[in-house]
Amino acid sequence: IELVKFANPLDENSLLQITASDGYNFFISMDEVYENSELILSIQDVGGNKSFNIVGAESPKAWVRGVVELKVIATNILEIQGKSNHPFSFNPSEWVNEMDSTFVRLGDKSVKLQGVALRALWIYAEPEPNSTDIVISSESQVIKLNSKEFNDSDEIRLFTYLDEEGMEFILGRMNGEVLLRNVTSMEIK
């Protein structure tokens, strides 16, 4: 999308957030914005009503109709460490194709968020054979989950929430339940 390239985003770890008129949000990595020549913002004119659509994205989830906003956002990085053969820094821009969306309850409102299955992060980290738990922390709270609670399902996810104040990681379930807000670290035990 030449329009986004023209804005000259400074951070290579940024994401392009696409917002549709129905509230749907999806991310496209800036790598894809720069490298995918098939990615376009198309204009559709039906009966004098114009709408914009994103087409050509690598993920079919990013083919968004009724685009009302394109925003380049800086991403946060979350360290996933501990008893792991492959500790890594979770960067949402590298996991876009693994994300699914659902409405998550944040206080008195529901917000549609993208999230990666905790199981996928666990597998990618290659836990040591005797590892059974993951400790997930925020500045004020700690949750310990046994891998049996998430290894057979993609229900528990690490969601990415964006607002005027920046990016926040939220641990939650696909049914919208929030387990922990403002996640700051994950440690495999």
Regions found by a protein language model. Give the residues of each.
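N-terminal intrinsically disordered, low-complexity segments enriched in P/E/S/T
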Residues: 1-189
